């Protein structure tokens, strides 16, 4: 029978088959092939005496490594607009990770009541201009949860963002229950105490939400090579193949159409600067491998 892994704890996988939840172990053949089932996997299982065994894993449409989550189709990138102030380099990092994993990203700005409408709109425009949808939310009060539930419909949705941004509180509001302990943000350091224990799919509005502890520790330089990075910036897309030199990295090469677009104001210069900084980190990391 077919089902979906919604939780994994200490080698046990909990597979939802229609309305039933079946505790399963994976066949030894997966370990021998260095394949590990992931939360979000669509699987075929056999059941005996109420216990299941995972026989096969269907092809994944996407996968994240930390935490191990498969078949994500949508990401809510949750950032507090204030307390702490939004870190655009960190936001760009999450957006690049979403693009690399072929996951649609929607930026959710939390704590919008702490800033003026003008400041809020300026931040929204800055993000809209690079091609991403922005939604205003107040995780504590539940503001914006209705439209988020509409977006979740039919998707497996991952919440990502820095510690203290309101992810756990938002999950509690979306699921109408205290799914996770919510850490208290330290006023001194402005970071949340991460209290999540494991990854899990939570059913919401004919879709699923995934809690993703540890996602913020991912380093781009660990995931991709220097040739991959430019394809993670949607605003580069129309220019990537029109540079003079094939394989142009949009850095020091002459007659680069991306650099020209930056000079003409068609590409945000701060995003481009983030691209160059990240590119240099990847190149340095590649040197250190050898």
UniProtKB/Swiss-Prot annotation:
Its cofactor is Zn(2+). GO terms for molecular function: GTP binding; GTPase activity; metal ion binding; rRNA binding. Binds 1 zinc ion per subunit. Its EC number is 3.6.1.-. Residues 61-218 form the CP-type G domain. It comes from the Bacteria. GO terms for cellular component: cytoplasm. It is found in: Cytoplasm. Zn(2+) binds at residues 243, 248, 250, 256. One of its GO terms (biological process) is ribosomal small subunit biogenesis. Keywords: Cytoplasm, GTP-binding, Hydrolase, Metal-binding, Nucleotide-binding, Ribosome biogenesis, RNA-binding, rRNA-binding, Zinc. GTP binds at residues 110-113, 161-169. Belongs to the TRAFAC class YlqF/YawG GTPase family. RsgA subfamily. One of several proteins that assist in the late maturation steps of the functional core of the 30S ribosomal subunit. Helps release RbfA from mature subunits. May play a role in the assembly of ribosomal proteins into the subunit. Circularly permuted GTPase that catalyzes slow GTP hydrolysis, GTPase activity is stimulated by the 30S ribosomal subunit. Monomer. Associates with 30S ribosomal subunit, binds 16S rRNA. This is Small ribosomal subunit biogenesis GTPase RsgA. The gene is rsgA.
